């Protein structure tokens, strides 16, 4: 999972006006679920939120906000973080279905760019521990939710990746709320999907190999310093900087590998401000032939 500053994007006024028009229509049928679902299911309604997908991709350099993968995690969907028609809570061992957050159907701040695998599994799952919002007048910000949210700066930090490519809760105490939320998120989004886990493992091995190479180069430099050796070290550090840049697929895996190495230079590298404009200048977000949204 990667942090996405959703406030960096604002749709056109035309799009916002259309959203308000659709919301007003939903509110006019607030007591008629069948009619609301009919409005949401209309082709024109779905095209409306689908139209933002390319803009959402730009916020993450074309990576799924949950998995940080591109093609590994299938075609992209525009996920409604809070499900629109119905919501499911199965945390008690029993599946409980309630009305969804229909008033957020056309609110772009409820959209998350998701790979199809995770979003297909997530569907209507959205467990709330306390203060569940049930109507437009309720404040969703007061909800104590199970899902970690990529638009919340501290939520991605509640997940870690190990050398096997496995994603796990960073909080190891099973009864702690952060652990419970992380475990729920991993399971409901299948963030340890086999191909995804394998790709993370490959990334880790590559990064670890580069760490060892820098160790070797540094040892040679310390024993017999030269400008050329120093340049080779800096070039290799620049290669690693590219691995942790926001345009790099699964960059969180590379960051985890550097952190696990405990090398002083690696930890210092993680604290650096990434020169995104320079490193990601050649990155182009590919257009998809298949457009999916939920």
Residue ranges, per PLM feature:
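A boundary/linker detector
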Residues: 1-51, 72, 277-294
């Amino acid at each position: 999972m990667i942090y996405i500053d959703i406030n960096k994007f604002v749709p056109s006024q035309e799009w916002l006006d259309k959203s308000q028009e659709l919301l007003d229509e939903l509110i006019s049928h607030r007591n008629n679920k069948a009619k609301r679902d009919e409005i949401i299911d209309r082709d024109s309604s779905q095209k409306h939120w689908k139209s933002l997908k390319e803009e959402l991709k730009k916020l993450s350099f074309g990576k799924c906000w949950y998995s940080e993968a591109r093609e590994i995690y299938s075609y992209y969907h525009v996920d409604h973080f809070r499900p629109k028609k119905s919501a499911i809570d199965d945390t008690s061992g029993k599946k409980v279905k309630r009305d969804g957050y229909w008033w957020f159907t056309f609110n772009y701040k409820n959209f998350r760019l998701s790979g199809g695998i995770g979003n297909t599994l997530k569907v209507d799952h959205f467990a709330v521990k306390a203060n569940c919002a049930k109507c437009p007048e309720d404040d969703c910000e007061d909800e104590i939710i199970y899902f970690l949210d990529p638009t919340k700066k501290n939520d991605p930090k509640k997940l870690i990746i190990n050398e096997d490519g496995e994603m796990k809760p960073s909080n190891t105490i099973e009864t702690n709320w952060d652990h419970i939320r992380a475990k729920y998120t991993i399971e409901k989004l299948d963030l340890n999907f086999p191909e995804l886990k394998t790709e993370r493992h490959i990334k880790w091995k590559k990064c670890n190999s580069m760490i060892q190479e820098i160790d070797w180069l540094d040892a040679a430099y310390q024993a017999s310093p030269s400008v050329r050796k120093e340049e080779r070290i800096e070039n290799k550090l620049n290669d690693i900087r590219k691995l942790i840049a926001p345009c790099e697929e699964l960059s969180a895996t590379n960051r985890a590998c550097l952190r696990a190495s405990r090398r002083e230079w690696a930890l210092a590298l993680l604290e650096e401000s990434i020169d995104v404009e320079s490193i990601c200048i050649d990155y182009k977000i590919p257009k998809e032939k298949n457009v999916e949204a939920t």
